């Protein structure tokens, strides 16, 4: 596979790494060609629900030249490999399963989680936080964009979970995409979500939606020891700021960082913001 980022000053590889219980997660890895940068702390990137790596291209093109980056896809993504003969069920997409996957994947990559910085978005942010509070994951720091305190779907979308997955394609085109266009103010954010939804594995989309419906993150956040920056965007109308602020308040080392837009978090301009926050962390943290 060619590097999805194009020509960058970094060595690229892609492979499926071990997840929990025989699942295998597609993982993109980059190591800077600059010898000093290649020795930097690794960054583990966990993107949002059904997100595709191309949506992060403006950020990653710059970042992979500065830090070793490992972009791990969660198990609802369409390139994830499930165990042979396994009949997929909603419980396969429970939040704790994502955490167990990530812990196994980090080990398979030969990384020491305590020496890594995490970067997550939406579902990815939520999975990282859940892993921290349950003691499944560890890290040096985590920069988390719009983690979900709860998964709130519009009332009209709930009946979708009762339908066969093969009916999702017309539903996404006729209802979900127009809804997103009305709901999302940022054009670039809408384009990313549209692309993600149209390329999603529909069966896994249905199963993970059913599993996420009853999820809440609140209990146990006070146990998280890893410093966490909770990043919110002023113009992001899809993710609730109230939830992010509550999460930051409950985290012993939580801090709110506001940026101009959701698109900004997908571009190289967010790198100095992350670096400035990480520079303030004391060695003991």
List where the protein language model places each region.
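Flexible "cap/lid" loop of the alpha/beta hydrolase fold
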Residues: 129-133, 137-168
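Active-site loop/oxyanion-hole signature of alpha/beta-hydrolase fold enzymes
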Residues: 70-119
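Short beta-strand/loop motif that positions the catalytic acidic residue
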Residues: 224, 230-232
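Catalytic active-site module of serine/aspartate enzymes centered on a nucleophile-bearing elbow/loop
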Residues: 253-285
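Short alpha-helix in the alpha/beta-hydrolase fold that links the catalytic acid
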Residues: 226, 240-249
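Conserved HGGG/HGGXW glycine-rich cap/lid loop of the alpha/beta-hydrolase fold
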Residues: 23-84
